Amino acid sequence: MGSRFFLALFLILLVLGCEVQATQQLQQDDPGSPALLDKVQESISSYWDTAKAAAQDLYQKTYLTSVDEKLRDMYSKSSAAMTTYASIFTDQILTLLKGE
């Protein structure tokens, strides 16, 4: 019975030692991760800001009032058409659900 006790005690200590070692390794890995994540976020943010600034600059250089007016007109007509079709679709769905 003494050897079983020592074997069980040895296994418990081995498991506890492995958990303590794993906890220490996780604590050592954690400080590096946020720094890497911050670097990646800053890099993506700077690329996005650069692309946005380039797109705005290109838009300002190629701004044409006639094209802008056509786009605004096209947007207003298409949004009016979508509103009409959405209301027709809604009426059809309500008619199907009511069963009239």
UniProtKB/Swiss-Prot annotation:
Proapolipoprotein C-II is synthesized as a sialic acid containing glycoprotein which is subsequently desialylated prior to its proteolytic processing. Proapolipoprotein C-II, the major form found in plasma undergoes proteolytic cleavage of its N-terminal hexapeptide to generate the mature form apolipoprotein C-II, which occurs as the minor form in plasma. It holds the Pfam family Apo-CII. The keyword Cytoplasm does not apply. Residues 66-74 are annotated as: Lipid binding. Its main location: secreted. The keyword Iron does not apply. Gene3D superfamilies: Apolipoprotein C-II. It is found in: Secreted. It comes from the Eukaryota. One of its GO terms (cellular component) is high-density lipoprotein particle. One of its GO terms (biological process) is positive regulation of phospholipid catabolic process. GO terms for molecular function: phospholipase activator activity; phospholipase binding. Keywords: Chylomicron, HDL, LDL, Lipid degradation, Lipid metabolism, Lipid transport, Secreted, Signal, Transport, VLDL. Residues 78-100 are annotated as: Lipoprotein lipase cofactor. Residues 1-22 form the signal peptide. Component of chylomicrons, very low-density lipoproteins (VLDL), low-density lipoproteins (LDL), and high-density lipoproteins (HDL) in plasma. Plays an important role in lipoprotein metabolism as an activator of lipoprotein lipase. PANTHER family: APOLIPOPROTEIN C-II. Belongs to the apolipoprotein C2 family. This is Apolipoprotein C-II. It comes from Microtus agrestis (Short-tailed field vole).
